[in-house]
Swiss-Prot record:
Keywords: DNA damage, DNA repair, Endonuclease, Exonuclease, Hydrolase, Manganese, Metal-binding, Nuclease. Homodimer. Forms a heterotetramer composed of two Mre11 subunits and two Rad50 subunits. GO terms for molecular function: 3'-5' exonuclease activity; DNA end binding; endonuclease activity; manganese ion binding; Y-form DNA binding. It comes from Pyrococcus abyssi (strain GE5 / Orsay). The gene is mre11. InterPro entries: Calcineurin-like_PHP_ApaH (IPR004843), DNA_Repair-Maintenance_Comp (IPR050535), Metallo-depent_PP-like (IPR029052), Mre11_archaea-type (IPR032885), Mre11_dom (IPR054741), Mre11_N (IPR041796), Mre11_thermococcales (IPR054745). This is DNA double-strand break repair protein Mre11.
């Protein structure tokens, strides 16, 4: 009889997107819907590849929600294996996931100070500490929490030596793979290359990228299921781009997770809030209004919509909001300045900035930029040699130079 499991990631419980509690409820409902499908599908176990929570310090209400939902698989004898992502990990010591483990709701994979042995977990001594691995019949589930690019740069051989499967095994990580992010999602950070992944696994269950993606490495699936709900307007269900005459329509990716049977993934779509991203660059007020009116019939009543209006003058934000019948409407008026160089020709300001810098400038210049702070932080974090990574690297270097004892080496990796 074959193996059947579910692969979820980036649940982000507690995320009050745009400061709206409604969105936190919808993120929770998406998780509950996914878990109930897992039960109906009679999966053997569930893998959560990082960021179950949107914060390492979730509110009591968010913890209560997680407990309620995770009781569903427990009551159906379905073990849940999870790792910490960049949002819900701690620098050192136990995380909120370990509390859920103590409650018998899930099993945390990764490096720890102490050996763990129970029905679904086993431990292996490594140079980093005790590598706690999941077990289900003859299949092992390996994984570790999110680590910075600086950590991988200094410890790639250690990483590969830790993960050497001897039989059927799954590797669970919450990282950006460079070949995937650079070619498909340049706004996401990457910490390692595809070739850095240890070989020999039958399935690579990844998290961190919020749009689903599949490829093959070493004859095995490498899969990002994406987030269960739409994370921002870049993760749109529909993008409308005005070309001066009509809108070009671009359909986004569905949201959901994977059911994996005999290590072959099958995508399961779940209902998610529609996000409509409208881009209009106009040459007159009449053209702007014409484009907005043509966009209105394409916008579902229950959707979240963002209008990006580029024009040389301010636009009537209230007028746009008054004619758009949607659950949530944002208008980002972006004034196009006519910059000219010394020769009198139009000056392309963008050429003085990298793609990443320009993206941050655009986000920070928006009227309601505070809603984009998380995205701006994520973009800044993706910069090579980021401040936090340098601090982490210095900490690691100190630990390797003067460890108090062998068990203290890389102590902050341990959960």
């Amino acid at each position: 009889m074959g193996i059947k499991f579910a692969h979820l990631a980036d649940v982000h419980l507690g995320y009050e997107q745009f400061n709206r509690s409604q969105r936190a409820e919808e993120f929770a409902k998406a998780f509950e819907d996914a878990i109930k499908i897992c039960v109906d599908e009679k999966v053997d176990f569930i893998v959560i590849a990082g960021d179950l929570f949107n914060s390492s310090r979730p509110s009591p209400g968010t913890i209560k929600t997680a407990v309620k939902i995770l009781q569903i698989p427990r009551d159906n004898n379905i073990p849940v294996f999870a790792i910490e992502g960049n949002h819900d990990r701690t620098q050192r010591g136990p995380s909120i996931l370990h509390l859920l483990e103590d409650l018998g709701l899930l099993y945390v994979l990764g490096v720890r100070d102490e050996k763990v042995e129970n029905e679904y977990l086993t431990s292996e001594k490594t140079k980093a500490g005790w590598l706690v691995k999941g077990m289900y019949k003859d299949v092992e589930i390996h994984g570790m929490k999110y680590m910075s690019a600086a950590w991988f740069e200094g410890n790639i051989e250690l990483f590969k030596s830790m993960f050497r499967p001897e039989g059927d095994a799954i590797l669970v990580l919450h990282q950006g793979v460079r070949e995937i992010t650079e070619n498909n999602y340049p706004n996401y950070s990457s910490e390692l290359s595809l070739s850095d992944l240890p070989k020999g696994y039958l399935y690579y269950a990844l998290g961190h990228i919020h749009k689903r993606f599949e490829l093959t490495y070493d004859d095995a699936p490498v899969v990002y299921p994406g987030s269960l709900e739409r994370w921002d307007f870049g993760d749109y269900s529909l993008k409308l781009t005005w070309n001066g005459f009509q809108f070009k329509e671009e359909v986004g990716v569905d949201k959901g997770f994977y059911i994996v049977e005999d290590f072959k993934p099958r995508f399961i779509r779940i209902n998610a809030r529609d996000f409509i991203d409208v881009h209009i660059k106009g040459h007159s007020e009449n053209e702007i209004k014409k484009a907005v009116k043509l966009a209105v019939p394409k916008i579902p009543r229950n959707s979240y919509v963002r209008f990006n209006i580029r024009w040389k003058r301010p636009v009537d934000v209230d007028w746009i909001k008054s004619i758009v019948n949607a659950e949530y409407v944002r208008v980002n008026p972006i004034i196009i300045k006519e910059e000219r160089g010394p020769d009198g020709k139009d000056l392309d300001v963008k050429k003085f900035f990298t793609e990443l810098e320009w993206k941050i400038i655009e986000l920070a210049s928006e009227k309601e930029y505070e809603y984009y702070l998380n995205q701006i932080i994520d973009l800044l974090a993706s910069e090579e040699g980021k401040v936090e990574a340098k601090i982490d690297a210095k900490r690691e270097e100190k630990k390797f130079v003067r460890p108090k004892n062998p068990g203290d080496i890389m102590a902050w990796v341990k959960g």
